[in-house]
């Protein structure tokens, strides 16, 4: 005997699920709800309890009879006040009503979010008054238009022995969630494989791409102008293969970071005379993480030092064992520069495609991924799209990431205008309102108004997410956050006076690795720390490191407002030491520098035996006699020292406030120029 659910047994034996569950509890048999499966032994016990002949009327049937009696009484009372004609009419109507068949109660109902009492009654094939009575018995006062929550709906439905299922509605603005849903098998048709070529620098990736392109472009397309749109197709044995002509690693990192899976097969290019190199290992990791098949192309076989056996031996360490050695990885010896082995490689790609059975449904609205995008002065926004499912047509309304529009024109990889593009076809389109990012998903829609609405909603959601409050962190509380597990990566923005310093600092900072927390440099630049640097730091939750440069007035104000930690240094090893100390929890500075004001040099005077006097105007804060100063020229610190004199007219003063003029001389420094900024600072003790 097969297992049966509680509500199914109740229905079979014409009893309510509630009564059955009560009976089961009396028999010391635990059931959680009406969906619980009953074992054969339990069913046999129940059969003994409910003899086959003794059929109990269900609660629903009892209520139906009661309802008819009530209705009949009401009608008879009304008819006492009416004439004979009305009585005959009533009898006719009553007779007609008696002939109306009873609507069967459904086995299952579905709902989304909530239902009103009226809607629930309709779904359960019951009168609203009946549902209201049941709710009243449960202590819930409800009207016909009142919304019921999920628990109440399930409670009422369970009482009738009806299964309830809640539908989860996915907003069309989040089309990524259903863009990859599989279509019915009968609608799927074979599509070309999408191939990415990866490998170490100078192992021949670009040469291989060029060799394939030059040898396999269809003869009929020879007159077409080959243009770089980020992807192209070739014909092999009457079948097409799509190659992504973009940096291989970028395809995996940037696109996979946005949830896009575009590659079907990876070609790993390894030079026969060089073997496995660091980027080769990185490429293997990317391909394995993406879960795509790997075909190894052993390139440069024309060189005298070529040693394919060595390559195979080295790759076995990374679980890429050749078929000849009992593994399942395809190895193809080639010479990209001479065009040898290219045909064999392409045949292997077709073989893998055949085994993997790449399919898509061309008879639906298109969906896919952005490969490249740019802004052209003449054409506007241009985006290269890879159609992964469906068919894209000129004129289709489309949403791409947070941008939207209508496909105005489509250009193929050979520069020809096309009207349709099927699965695995790369095309360049125009017509979007803004430039999307590589890896953004796209979807075509039937209605332009709907596409615009979805695009605007997505853009608004992205803006809200970007503006969302983030907990800023500084070096002082960094160790605590690391200990609590809140920080796995430290974002830094590095600015310096010259490019060499930027590169040296970035290289040194990237090597820091304390307690599994790594340093990530999100931006570098030469020159003063600007307001845009602070805004980027705020959005990325980053710390700004300045080497021999200073923030301008706006940057400083924004940093205070956004609570961004800005660290300024003049010695590289001090920067590294400070970051490492902060990560290890040993950062304990006794003093902290506090900038108290800035003055702009408006005019200079050279005086014998005194030196250069700077006529200044205090633009921010105040300048004090005992403060340290630094001279900033075009955002770069050119000198750091002490004030020699501070005067107002001819009098020595202790301080000069904002919006006042003053005369300043700097100890042991006379090369002051108009436009220089004199920044005053003091060292304050930090309370720990």
Swiss-Prot record:
Function text: One of the essential components for the initiation of protein synthesis. Protects formylmethionyl-tRNA from spontaneous hydrolysis and promotes its binding to the 30S ribosomal subunits. Also involved in the hydrolysis of GTP during the formation of the 70S ribosomal complex.
Where is this protein found? Cytoplasm
Q: Which organism is it from?
A: Bacillus mycoides (strain KBAB4) (Bacillus weihenstephanensis)
Which residue stretches belong to region G1? 199-206
Q: Which residues form the tr-type G domain?
A: 190-359
Main location group = cytoplasm
Q: Which residues form a coiled coil?
A: none
For this entry, the protein name equals: Translation initiation factor IF-2
Q: Which family does it belong to?
A: Belongs to the TRAFAC class translation factor GTPase superfamily. Classic translation factor GTPase family. IF-2 subfamily.
Hydrolase listed as a keyword: no
Q: Which InterPro entries match?
A: EF-G-like_DII (IPR053905), IF2_II (IPR044145), IF2_N (IPR006847), P-loop_NTPase (IPR027417), Small_GTP-bd (IPR005225), T_Tr_GTP-bd_dom (IPR000795), TF_IF2_bacterial-like (IPR000178), TIF_IF2 (IPR015760)
Q: Where is this region: Disordered?
A: 53-101
Q: Where is the composition biased (Basic residues)?
A: 71-83
